[in-house]
């Protein structure tokens, strides 16, 4: 009984326009950022190295290489109000559910094959 009530409340806050993406895909996430008194959308593009959770608590981690070869990882809640958009740039072909091994790779070794 209580589980049904929780699911009903969660369903109210879940987004409907979330694209289907998987680990290994390159995604572009638009995040709403507040700077002083103005608000803008900041794009963060990278490879999805982890997906976890389900329902309202579903989240994913995106990794990209920033300037000077420094790796940056950000974790986003799929249904968070700050996440403006999720756009799949390219589909990756991987055989793992977690791509933490990419943290130790640089350059061409960190490339992921494209799914056809």
Swiss-Prot record:
Keyword Heme assigned: no
Alphabetic keyword roster: Ribonucleoprotein, Ribosomal protein
GO molecular function: structural constituent of ribosome
Gene Ontology annotations of biological process type: translation
GO cellular component, as recorded: cytosolic large ribosomal subunit
Classification via InterPro entries: Ribosomal_bL19 (IPR001857), Ribosomal_bL19_CS (IPR018257), Ribosomal_bL19_sf (IPR038657), Translation_prot_SH3-like_sf (IPR008991)
PROSITE patterns noted in UniProt: RIBOSOMAL_L19
Keyword Ribonucleoprotein annotated: yes
Highest taxon above the source species: Bacteria
Family, per entry: Belongs to the bacterial ribosomal protein bL19 family.
Function: This protein is located at the 30S-50S ribosomal subunit interface and may play a role in the structure and function of the aminoacyl-tRNA binding site.
The protein's name in its UniProt record: Large ribosomal subunit protein bL19
Organism in which the protein naturally occurs: Roseiflexus sp. (strain RS-1)
Record lineage: Bacteria, Bacillati, Chloroflexota, Chloroflexia, Chloroflexales
